[in-house]
Amino acid sequence: MSKADIIVGIQWGDEGKGKVVDKLCENYDFVCRSAGGHNAGHTIWVNGVRYALHLMPSGVLHPRCINIIGNGVVVSPEVLIAEMAQFENLKGRLYISDRAHLNLKHHSLIDIAKEKLKGKNAIGTTGKGIGPSYADKINRTGHRVGELLEPQRLCEALIKDFEANKTFFEMLEIEIPSAEELLADLKRFNEILTPYITDTTRMLWKALDEDKRVLLEGAQGSMLDIDHGTYPYVTSSSTISAGTLTGLGLNPKEAGNIIGIVKAYATRVGNGAFPTEDKGEDGEKIAQIGKEIGVSTGRKRRCGWFDAVAVRYTARLNGLDALSLMKLDVLDGFEKIKICRAYEYKGMEIDYIPSDLENVQPIYEEMDGWDKVFGIKDYDLLPENAKKYIARLEELAGVKVKYISTSPERDDTIIL
């Protein structure tokens, strides 16, 4: 019996998980998404071509990989169908859990309306309706992908839901779709998606029993976890390694190696605590060189220095076996590079994450920069200062680096 290896982001998302998964996919039979929705975005570059994935597992770019969208994901049929249109021959290579919850148009309308009502206290969601979809799930009023197999029955259930919440929708100025319009959409979803809907948990159990190689692909980042992130400025699902298991119906004994994906600096989209944010020239330089624009939202990412306190925290949360250090090349040409080694908090120096992270100040150490690592594929060819930087990050995080990315391209990766 084999075990499932896990890839997780360990900052605030956008760490470069897509490139790592894409690089590793050739060694796996199954690649699986476990949580989130189309608020998450993976960018993968292959031979100069950019692929932006939101719901599809990154294994879709490898013809021999079977791709699974697990029960923990909230699925927008509209978005998924549009994404599927980019690819050919998906039958037999893509499966969607019948237990995954649906993310429908009214969810995004609720999301946007509620954010507007919050004004300056808005969380900064993507507006994709992910929170409202998970809220329906937790309230036990949601609808699942398997219900698409009976579109007439699902339509009737949704109309009843809309009528029961009519006052709420009117307050948010959301127009309720007609039964005819809704049924037409559901029938279209049914026609296209039915061949892909199945019990993916049983499929994965069988795969592991048959010693197939399985890779679980986390979405977003550990500092956005609903329980362990910078609440309330978090996502609506578990983004740590344990969450990937529940989001696919696997047990803890079925977990294999766990790799944490981390940028050589730090970024964050939306509001919330971000201790190492640099609002000056260096932060702007990182944003420009790193092309730090959100894949799902098009919003500019906030940029700053590597936060070793946060990474050490998430390394323990996830039980990491190794790190994959991404976008090291973005720091090419910086004379000095900062690392946050600790925080100042209520007059004390601390090395942990308090629940009120917005009240800390970073304590930095500086290291000398380097000229260029872009495109290097051999560790021995890295500049000495880059090697020292990597070694210091390993020391502070308490986890060894196994992969180093030196450009957006799939093959520009150092394996240690």
UniProtKB/Swiss-Prot annotation:
Taxonomic superkingdom: Bacteria
GO CC term (a single one): cytoplasm
Chief localization: cytoplasm
Annotated GO biological process: 'de novo' AMP biosynthetic process; IMP metabolic process
Gene3D superfamilies to which the protein is assigned, alphabetical: Adenylosuccinate Synthetase, subunit A, domain 1, Adenylosuccinate Synthetase, subunit A, domain 2, Adenylosuccinate Synthetase, subunit A, domain 3
Keyword Isomerase applies: no
Active site: D14 (proton acceptor), H42 (proton donor)
Record: residues binding substrate: V295, S296, T297, G298, R299, K300, R301
Residue sites binding GTP per the record: 13-19, 41-43, 301, 327-329, 405-407
GO MF terms held by the record: adenylosuccinate synthase activity; GTP binding; magnesium ion binding
Pfam families (alphabetical): Adenylsucc_synt
Subcellular location: Cytoplasm
Family classification: Belongs to the adenylosuccinate synthetase family.
Function recorded in the entry: Plays an important role in the de novo pathway of purine nucleotide biosynthesis. Catalyzes the first committed step in the biosynthesis of AMP from IMP.
Protein name, entry field: Adenylosuccinate synthetase
Gene: purA
